Design a protein with these regions (language model features):
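Intrinsically disordered, low-complexity Pro/Gly/Ser/Thr-rich segments with frequent PxxP/GP/PP motifs
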Residues: 97-126, 204-230
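Terminal connector regions
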Residues: 28-34, 122-164, 205, 229-244
Length: 244
């Protein structure tokens, strides 16, 4: 399905302590900042949308880190969506594309939404990223009634007993995930890192993931997430779980 990407300046959803141009004036290893976002709207059915979002960028030596978080929303009352496709492009000030990344997820139930977050890296080539273009979509045939399919709603994987342990390279996030659905499932357990925007509201901007496999209906399993993203200057964190 073709998508039309519409660039949009960030307002209350994201915080920018200083313009990217001002950040670039600092020594290269020191720049960091929340950056712009564009969204995509599909044209058929009630298309998947991005309900909320956040992103962050920083440099460590010759490596650029791009982190992102988005709440994917399915407003269809009678159609679940299989294999939602997230596409991300990092763009320069002149509009040229520096780097792209994408991710396929599992089901989004009817009239439901959930958060997903992650990060990717690339080698710095002297061009400072000025913004992010973000899209979410699905193929026409992946809009399907959920009857007879093992589709979980966002609240059916319950995360409890969460804690942050250790420090430095030994930092880890632990807890339990319970499958409250009628189906055996695998889960992506995601720690969402949040930063405050200009209004003081905390917005997810990054995530690290653990995979918990073969969770039977009613079963609870432990998890441990290691912060491989390296993001450390977040204001708070939260852990969620989604079907995979």
């Amino acid at each position: 399905m073709r998508k039309r990407i519409i660039a949009a300046a960030l307002a209350a959803a994201m915080m920018l302590a200083m313009p990217i141009s001002a950040i670039a004036a600092k020594k290269p290893d020191e720049w960091s900042g929340l950056i712009e976002l564009g969204q995509t709207n599909a044209t058929q059915y009630e298309p998947l949308g991005i309900k909320n979002h956040g992103s962050y960028a920083w440099r460590d030596g010759s490596t650029i880190y791009i982190s992102y978080a988005l709440e994917i929303e399915n407003t269809n009352k009678n159609l679940a969506v299989w294999f939602p496709h997230i596409e991300i492009a990092v763009v320069a000030e002149d509009g040229s594309v520096i780097k792209t990344d994408d991710e396929y997820l599992d089901w989004v139930a009817e009239d439901d939404s959930y958060w997903y977050a992650g990060y990717f890296t690339y080698e710095y080539d002297g061009t400072i990223p000025a913004g992010i273009e973000m899209a979410v979509s699905a193929q026409d045939y992946n809009y399907q009634p959920s009857a007879g399919k093992e589709v979980l709603r966002s609240g059916e994987l319950a995360v409890t007993n969460t804690s942050k342990r250790g420090s430095g390279y030994e930092t880890r996030f632990t807890g339990k995930v319970t499958n409250n659905s009628a189906y055996k499932t695998n889960a992506k357990v995601i720690v969402l890192y949040k930063m405050k925007d200009e209004s003081g509201e905390e917005v997810p901007v990054c995530g690290d993931i653990d995979y918990v496999l073969d969770i039977q209906p009613g079963e609870t399993k432990n998890f441990e997430i290691h912060p491989y993203s390296g993001l450390s200057n977040y204001s708070s964190w939260e852990i969620v779980a989604i079907q995979m």
